[in-house]
């Protein structure tokens, strides 16, 4: 499950908690039973949460449509058609993430529209001109019709208003964050550590794509080794949902060529987040070249893990503040990343405690996701919150 998946679940959880019983309607894309990205326990947990909220769940069979602009356009139309019986009178239609950026083109005039993109092609696949054009059209049509767009970070706001040309006034701040359930995942069931990691390890995890910067991390570890710096065992979770992809093959070859002591895991299991609470953990590294937000530092702060080492790519610059909540380096610079990682490994117990305390404080003060979602609802659907207040009284 990607960071976007965790964030979308947190968004649903916040809505389920804030909205009156029975008001929430969810139109999810159903993955086939054998799909490698499907997590049965995750599914059970979400279904239970939605049932408790009295939510109506209207599933779509559209997994094959998620990979192209034409498919996403059709998926957006199907989703609105499925939800349309519930969109009369006061209603808010939320297009949650990129595949649903075109819902504003099909929404009935009576419905307000909010789009919540968690990334864009311009950020992670700048060569994909057709996808970028489709995203721009969906965003533009929505705001032209009076809809709004949520920005998950300051960087994403600048990106939406700059690269995609949205007026500043139509972009709402919805800073990404954690719900209590997300923090429970960090402290939940744990997989056994890989062999070699029990005496100390460095952890990095994310999707197996070049923009995550894992090759830069491997080169940084190699540079430290060349300098005689003892780097603990690297546990690299570079995950995909299918067969091993070309980037994973490249990473495996790089580990072998550089002679790095590392474990490469190519399939994601939510239980790996439990490693953030392991006392053998020496550092958490987020080496991204591009990052709309980046949840892993927050998860590390929630677990008291670290030090956190991250690049300043995108939203990471908001959470990993050099010398305050962690150590930072410019993106796509193995040399600078090696310096930051060396600082983390050399940090004294007092420094580690200070960084962890500052990270926990930043999480509590700026990234309480329940507070962020409620703030957006107060702007987009105050009538729903008023109804909830009326029910409570």
What is each model feature region?
Residues 322-323, 327-334, 343-349:
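Conserved acidic donor-binding segment of nucleotide-sugar-dependent glycosyltransferases
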Residues 248-270, 275:
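Nucleotide-activated donor-binding/catalytic signature segment of Leloir-type glycosyltransferases, i.e.
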Residues 6-10, 209-225:
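A conserved mid-protein helix/loop that constitutes part of the nucleotide-sugar donor-binding site
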Residues 3, 349, 353-380:
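A charged, aromatic-enriched C-terminal amphipathic alpha-helix characteristic of glycosyltransferases
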Residues 289:
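Aromatic "clamp/platform" in nucleotide-sugar-dependent glycosyltransferases that forms part
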């Amino acid at each position: 499950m990607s960071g976007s998946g965790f964030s979308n679940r947190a968004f649903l959880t916040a809505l389920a908690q804030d909205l009156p019983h029975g008001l929430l309607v969810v139109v999810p894309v159903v993955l086939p039973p054998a799909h490698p990205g499907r997590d049965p326990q995750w599914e059970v947990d979400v279904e239970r949460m939605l049932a408790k909220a009295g939510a109506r769940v209207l599933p779509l069979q559209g997994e094959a449509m998620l990979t192209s602009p034409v498919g996403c356009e059709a998926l957006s139309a199907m989703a609105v058609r499925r939800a349309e019986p519930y969109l009369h009178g006061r209603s808010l239609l939320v297009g949650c993430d990129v595949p649903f950026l075109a819902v504003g083109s099909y929404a009935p005039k009576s419905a307000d529209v909010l789009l919540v993109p968690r990334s864009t092609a311009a950020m992670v696949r700048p060569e994909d001109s057709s996808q970028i054009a489709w995203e721009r059209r969906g965003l533009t049509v929505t705001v032209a019709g009076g809809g709004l767009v949520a920005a998950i970070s300051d960087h994403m706001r600048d990106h939406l208003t700059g690269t995609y040309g949205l007026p500043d006034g139509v972009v709402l701040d919805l800073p990404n964050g954690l719900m209590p359930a997300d923090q429970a995942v960090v402290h939940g069931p744990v997989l056994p550590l890989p062999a070699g990691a029990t005496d100390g390890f460095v952890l990095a995890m994310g999707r197996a794509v070049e923009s995550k910067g894992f090759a830069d991390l491997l080169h940084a570890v190699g540079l430290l080794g060349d300098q005689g710096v003892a780097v603990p065992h690297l546990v690299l979770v570079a995950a995909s949902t299918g067969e091993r992809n070309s980037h994973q093959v490249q990473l495996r070859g790089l580990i072998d060529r550089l002679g790095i002591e590392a474990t490469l895991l190519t399939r994601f299991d939510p239980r790996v987040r439990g490693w953030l609470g392991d006392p053998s953990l020496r550092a958490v590294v987020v080496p991204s070249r591009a990052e709309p937000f980046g949840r892993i530092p927050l998860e590390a702060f929630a677990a008291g893990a670290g030090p956190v080492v991250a690049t300043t790519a995108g939203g990471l610059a908001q959470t990993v503040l050099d010398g305050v909540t962690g150590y930072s380096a410019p993106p796509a610079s193995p040399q600078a990343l090696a310096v930051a990682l060396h600082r983390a490994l050399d940090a004294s117990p007092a420094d580690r405690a200070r960084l962890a305390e500052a990270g926990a404080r930043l999480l509590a003060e700026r990234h309480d996701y329940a507070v962020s979602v409620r703030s957006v609802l107060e702007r987009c659907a105050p009538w729903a919150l008023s109804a909830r207040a009326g029910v409570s009284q």
